[in-house]
């Protein structure tokens, strides 16, 4: 069964637990037309997309008072940071920023790429999720509405909703996936562990360690097991997926901890 058809016909599997959600825009002064078009798509006023409220059953209520405008396209971070830090965000409201970025996350210039990621970090520190929009893809693109379902699904997930889940019976299992990646700019190998607390694929958390931090990785896995057991009695099995064949030295801290 195609998940897209399921969400189109029946709506998302699980809505955001937040009862108060507010959107706000972050944009360059010259990108108001882009923001207006995105706004009209999100409200369902343009052909090709029914709007966020109808597609993911999430109320779309942009707060114009929180809108942030900046002038420097090359480095908007200082302007945005100043405005964000001077704002008083209601902690009882789940905020999501629609950032119309003048800088692509794949731009060759490293300093410009960092602007993209530092802004996301700044927002996350304020407990604000964000959805980035590339203005170059919006204005003159008559097919842009085909991108809206994916954007809407991403927004729902960032609001802690669940678009769909695996069609399998729920079991008391803890699944741990261990993967690796290399940061090409600094030449450092990292190991990451992603935890899924159910066999339905619902993601819970992610932690990252350097390649030689095998004991820290083991500790992370053991904490996940203990946290799971504390709220789920009768765990049936623990499944650990490794990205490679693990050496005895790497596996031993994990096995030793599980025995205790």
What is each model feature region?
Residues 1-260:
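Long, low-complexity, intrinsically disordered terminal regions
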């Amino acid at each position: 069964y195609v998940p897209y058809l399921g969400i189109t016909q029946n709506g998302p599997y699980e809505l955001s637990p937040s009862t108060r959600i507010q959107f706000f825009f972050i944009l360059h002064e010259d990108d108001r037309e882009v923001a207006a078009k995105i706004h009209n798509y999100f409200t369902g006023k343009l052909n090709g997309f029914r709007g966020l409220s109808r597609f993911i059953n999430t109320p779309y209520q942009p707060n114009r008072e929180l809108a942030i405008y900046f002038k420097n396209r090359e480095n908007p971070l200082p302007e945005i940071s100043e405005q964000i830090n001077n704002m008083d965000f209601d902690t009882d409201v789940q905020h999501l920023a629609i950032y119309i970025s003048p800088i692509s996350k794949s731009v060759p210039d490293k300093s410009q790429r960092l602007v993209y990621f530092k802004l996301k970090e700044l927002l996350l520190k304020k407990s604000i999720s964000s959805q980035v929009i590339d203005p170059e893809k919006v204005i003159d693109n008559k097919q842009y509405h085909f991108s809206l379902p994916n954007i809407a699904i991403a927004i729902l997930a960032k609001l802690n909703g669940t678009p769909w889940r695996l069609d399998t019976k729920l079991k008391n299992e803890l699944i741990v996936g261990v993967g690796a990646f290399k940061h090409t700019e600094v030449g450092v190998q990292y190991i990451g562990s992603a935890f899924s607390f159910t066999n339905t694929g619902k993601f819970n958390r992610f932690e990252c360690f350097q390649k030689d931090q095998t004991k820290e990785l083991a500790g992370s896995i053991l904490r996940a097991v203990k946290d799971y057991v504390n709220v789920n009695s009768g765990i049936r099995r623990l499944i650990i997926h490794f990205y490679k064949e693990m050496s005895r030295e790497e596996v031993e801290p994990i096995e030793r901890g599980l025995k205790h």
